[in-house]
Structure formats: C-alpha cells, structure tokens
Amino acid sequence: MNVNQDIVKRSYPTDHFDQFLEDFLTEIQARNYRITRVNHIDNIFDREEAGIEITARFRHYKIIEFCNLNSCSELISGDLLSGVFMPVRFVVYQVEEEENVAHVAFLDPNAFARLFHSPSLSQVAEELSRDMTDVLAEMAI
C-alpha cells in the first residue's frame, strides 16, 4: 500500500462542523449503509500522555465506521481474511488552526482488495470505492 495513493482526502469549507458531520452521516446512509459507530476522539491528546509528542492538534476528530451487510458478506465470501478491513471507515476532522474547514479521508477499498488477488473481492471493493467517492462528491455540492 502507498499512503499517498491509497488514502483519499478532501477538504470542505464549513462554518458548523457538527452540521457538516450530520450531513455527512446522512449521505452515507442514503447509499444504504448502516453507521455502526462514530468514535469521537476530539481533543484527547491535549492531555499530556506518557511523554507522547503532540505533532497534530485538532478541534474535532471522528472515525465513522459503516457497512452494508450484503457487501460485507460478498467481501468475506471472496476471502475470509478480508474481514480485518471491516467495517470500512471515514475520518472527519478539523485541525486546530483551520476552524472553517472540515477534512475527510478514507482508505480506498481497492487498496486492500489488491492484497487478496481476488477478482470477486476487487469487484465489490470497486463498488464500495465508488460509493465512498460519491459521498465526497455530494458533500462538495
């Protein structure tokens, strides 16, 4: 995997991060995906922990986990180990010095599908990648 090629990133102007996040979750659900969890990391590292050097400061950091049970079943049927990449995730965050910008990123499902050399897994990953990219495109409107 190549981080610069396989992680898809976009940035969006926003005055209200919480509203952006709500709209983002709605876009995921509109494509027949179920939100399984939203991890609210936010400013947890502002607490000095065990000598960890803080190099990235952020206002908000959300890890959105989601799945479509049919797609999950198809992926697992292609290779039982593909489940280590599930559920799929978006990260939505706002860095401390950019209060009017929301950033979104995800690991392109095609990247993990290439690890398995499975045509059926690649087909499902392509559909998932397209849906995730469509969510990003819709947020730009």
Across the structure, where does each feature detected by a protein language model lie?
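Well-ordered alpha/beta subsegment
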Residues: 105, 112-141
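Short, ordered beta-strand-loop transition motifs
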Residues: 2, 56-58, 95-98
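Terminal, regulation- and interaction-focused segments at domain boundaries
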Residues: 1-31
